[in-house]
Amino acid sequence: MQSNKTFNLEKQNHTPRKHHQHHHQQHHQQQQQQQQQQQQQPPPPIPANGQQASSQNEGLTIDLKNFRKPGEKTFTQRSRLFVGNLPPDITEEEMRKLFEKYGKAGEVFIHKDKGFGFIRLETRTLAEIAKVELDNMPLRGKQLRVRFACHSASLTVRNLPQYVSNELLEEAFSVFGQVERAVVIVDDRGRPSGKGIVEFSGKPAARKALDRCSEGSFLLTTFPRPVTVEPMDQLDDEEGLPEKLVIKNQQFHKEREQPPRFAQPGSFEYEYAMRWKALIEMEKQQQDQVDRNIKEAREKLEMEMEAARHEHQVMLMRQDLMRRQEELRRMEELHNQEVQKRKQLELRQEEERRRREEEMRRQQEEMMRRQQEGFKGTFPDAREQEIRMGQMAMGGAMGINNRGAMPPAPVPPGTPAPPGPAAMMPDGTLGLTPPTTERFGQAATMEGIGAIGGTPPAFNRPAPGAEFAPNKRRRY
């Protein structure tokens, strides 16, 4: 009985749904007719001047210089447009002429077989204006489709530290290649969300950054949390999916049988809708629990990191202190070695000085000794001279005595006396005696005996060989 009521209720609800579906189809057909009428209208004329565009109704003048922001880079991937539904016979020159109103085009590419192309304008603002004005414009029986081209060299950066700005993000990723744009995503209050976008000028730089950051740990600040890099999801949040682009197949018509509505309580739709809501709620709760677990794990890791950082700093300070102590010890050893070397050098210098002084003293003594020996060799000393004079005196006395006993040799008259010492010698016949000296008393005694016949000397002197008193020393 209850099932019949449910069936009747669904049957009653199905009747107005079909009526609403019929009105929806009629509204859709009216929209298609209006679009066809707009396509049949001639396109607005495109001025040849690329610096300004004037409207017949409003008379607007566009200065292209005003659409460039200060410091904005030109001809980037963000100003690249995709143009679809192109005629198969369109040329590159016609493509440039179509967009010359919006400034000089930097890049033009046409794929005639597939009927699409790409064009790059100077700035993002000019590309947006061209997109709005040329989208859905009829050209040779086809309706142009203008969209922003997908940026294949853009990356999403996660786990950004709190104090990372756009400039720092661009500077950090510029090591991989030329960066066209780097943005740190913030919330409605301007607080960083920990995510960012980096757009490179080419795919090789983006691939290099993706590989390097995946293999290693890329740090942007002192906080040792590495960033994660992944390809950016190309999502169109501006145009979305218009009705005219939806594929009208059998599944489309089946889904569009029911209009937007609230499920009636107690119905089949309501029962399974509630089950779907329970599943979504469970997913949300589990996601919240996962987020809480991750948050707790992050806080715990940050606390451990701070403790480890403090310990690491203490260890570094200890190592630095030990290094400085070792350096001081090494410097002290070097100083001691230098002092020892200096002392040894001073000792060697002192020893060398003493040796030189000793050598000089020896040389002086040797020189004096040689001088004395040379003086003695030339002039005999007083003692030797006395001995020699004594011997000469004794020999002279003996000669005089002998001459007194012998007759004188006859000398012829007129013969001069012989020169030399013999002429100076005293003659016994004349009764002359040589003068006596105190030192040669023996010779005087002998001379007196021989010449005068025993006259005593001036003072009694013992003969040679006589013994002296005990306290007297013998003189030679």
Swiss-Prot record:
Species: Rattus norvegicus (Rat)
Keywords: Acetylation, Activator, Biological rhythms, Chromosome, Coiled coil, DNA damage, DNA recombination, DNA repair, DNA-binding, Immunity, Innate immunity, Isopeptide bond, Methylation, mRNA processing, mRNA splicing, Nucleus, Phosphoprotein, Repeat, Repressor, RNA-binding, Transcription, Transcription regulation, Ubl conjugation
Subcellular location field: Nucleus; Nucleus, Nucleolus; Nucleus speckle; Chromosome
Protein name: Non-POU domain-containing octamer-binding protein
Disordered as annotated region, ranges: 1-56, 448-476
Entries under Gene3D superfamilies matching the protein: 3.30.70.330, 6.10.250.1170
Coiled-coil residue windows: 274-378
Omega-N-methylarginine found at: R461
Region of interest (DBHS), ranges: 60-379
Basic residues bias locations: 14-27
Polar residues biased stretches: 1-10
Entry annotated with the keyword Methyltransferase: no
Residues recorded with modification Phosphothreonine: T6, T433, T445, T455
Modified residues (Phosphoserine): S152, S267
InterPro entries: NOPS (IPR012975), Nucleotide-bd_a/b_plait_sf (IPR012677), p54nrb_RRM1 (IPR034552), RBD_domain_sf (IPR035979), RRM_dom (IPR000504)
Role, per record: DNA- and RNA binding protein, involved in several nuclear processes. Binds the conventional octamer sequence in double-stranded DNA. Also binds single-stranded DNA and RNA at a site independent of the duplex site. Involved in pre-mRNA splicing, probably as a heterodimer with SFPQ. Interacts with U5 snRNA, probably by binding to a purine-rich sequence located on the 3' side of U5 snRNA stem 1b. Together with PSPC1, required for the formation of nuclear paraspeckles. The SFPQ-NONO heteromer associated with MATR3 may play a role in nuclear retention of defective RNAs.
All residue ranges annotated as the RRM domain in the record: 80-147, 154-235
PANTHER family: RNA RECOGNITION MOTIF-CONTAINING
